Amino acid sequence: PWVKNISRPNEVSRGLQDRHIAVWQSHGNYFKNDKNEWGWQRPRLFCTTEDLFTQSFVLPYVIPMLENAGAVVYTPRERDTQKNEIIVDNDTPNASLYLEVGSKKAKWDRASVRGFAQKKTIYQDGENPFADGTCRMISTERKKKKNKDQAFAEWVPTLPATGTYAVYVSYQTLPNSVSDAKYLVFHNGGVTEFKVNQKIGGGTWVYLGTFEFDKGNNDYGMVVLSNESSEHGVVCADAVRFGGGMGNISRGGKISGLPRYLEGARYSAQWAGMPYDVYAGRKGENDYADDINTRSNTINYLSGGSVYNPTQPGLGVPLEMTCLLY
């Protein structure tokens, strides 16, 4: 699987175990090119709009139900309702902390490919944050007795408020990437371990889970990537994101002013490093049509090169089903 929660107390033996499913809630706030303003795709009705109403089913119920049945779920729209967003990255010094520790046999080094860097707060059409920075890599080692001489990277965020935050990691898929990169998420509920297949899905945000964190900067609120692996190769480290955040894509010289989860998929796709033709087939002239196509284009690009979509170039994620609530 792309992502596996090793700390899960039960192992799903049937059902959707290790199945990869794409789910989206459709619509979302978008830029109306003809009116030069942001707005909803559907009319207001009974004190809501379809752009908001479908999310009230998909985010708290449908996606968790599928995940509890064993599935790995991807959504092309932002899934986290947290308005705050903190990114910890080797390229972007801030109040948060990024730390590397090597071992006797393995040292961190710069990878030969581009990585994520947040060099601005507002992005224009076509700008890709996953092409603006660098990423790090280190050779893997077998598990050691008594956990001595371990190599790892740490991302320690300085969070503006106590609350629940989605945790997204990122990396680049390298020629000798491993399928069992070990991530540990330290949060208020303890420590949760994940194995991430870095052979697929490089160059975008990879969702691990949503956790409770305290305000500020502390050693029980962080993400750790170890170089421990059962395979001979490398693990890659890039930015880690805490929280869904606010929309930061400018259209017509203005941003939506809304949390990212309320925006359409077109803008989440750009922030997630998707190629321009995935989210802007109309070359920035029709965001409504682009948003409709972005949802499926993102899934096709993610699954490109996998057994389910072998002829299209992409990130190799074996997404075998798409489900949407319209």
Model regions: which residues?
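Non-catalytic propeptide/linker segments at domain boundaries
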Residues: P1-G39, P76, A237-L258
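Functional beta-strand-loop-alpha-helix junction segments that form "active/interaction loops"
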Residues: Y74-E85, Y261-T311
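Short beta-strands within extracellular/lumenal beta-sheet-rich domains
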Residues: G133-L159
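A short beta-strand element within beta-rich, extracytoplasmic domains
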Residues: A151-P175
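Short, surface-exposed beta-strand/strand-loop-strand elements in extracellular ectodomains
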Residues: T173-T192
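Extracellular carbohydrate recognition and processing domains
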Residues: N188-N217
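Short beta-strand-plus-loop segments that form exposed binding edges in beta-rich domains
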Residues: V223-V234
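Conserved small/polar residues in nucleotide/adenosyl-binding loops
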Residues: Y326
